[in-house]
């Protein structure tokens, strides 16, 4: 069968077959009352190829065995069973790069007549050139073009786990756990200056197609922030020169960062983000506009030292000056506004030694100026 005039593409595999490129389907087999049995078939399709055997039943399931296949950046083998409008896929892939899936997956694509149930072993699961999660097992289901469930677990314990539950009452629950969280964050937020760490995320996806909203709780443990020019400027404004030198050298260690985020309508909203380390702690609230790349974030930075902690834990002193045990007495209130890559930093030079009431007044003043 001549396929040279056929054009086709698989964006997630970075595969394109132009109409002018050669293409052919060759097969050997025999016909019986039960259907067609192909003892050998071979597909050549531009730079892609596949070969195997097949049983095409007159009634019931169609079974296609792929002994080897190559399409763009994907290589593998497996079996496809087709019955009515259901596709069952079992197989093995040599490499799968999630970068291609992330950039080409369309959650609002036209409805497909097929439901899919795939069970795959992936030898190398990658995220661009930043991360290699090693061997993973993937189970995914899809109905009418919509992802209904997903279970992704690395062979090596605690490297990567992702779960998506079937939708219930309009909500899908998503959980993620991975190591090397700094590299994952740097992929989605380039130049974030995080290294190492373990990320745990629990969230909910809801809304209509085209207006999906993802709300999640995040928990980031044992990471290091290195260089981070924005943080360095805030430290400088806070007169914390010693910590700033550590930041530009070996980095500042944080034991944990927790909070909430909301991602939808082309915005990321940060709520009650608290990060605490051996030398400093941070609080953050604000918005990142993904269309304009503008940010509006406010926060506080305070040093972790014995005097600051001691004063914050004195009931009356800590409540009046610091706002409670969870916040330091000596803290600098700051704001980030403008373009995300080069925002304007404003800080209250008096807030480092000011009572909590003065800090709140400063925040209100800045918000009014906006």
Give, region by region, the residue ranges found by the protein language model.
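Membrane-proximal interfacial segments on either side of biological membranes
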Residues: 1-41, 53-254, 260-268, 280-370
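A short, well-structured beta->alpha microelement
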Residues: 43-49
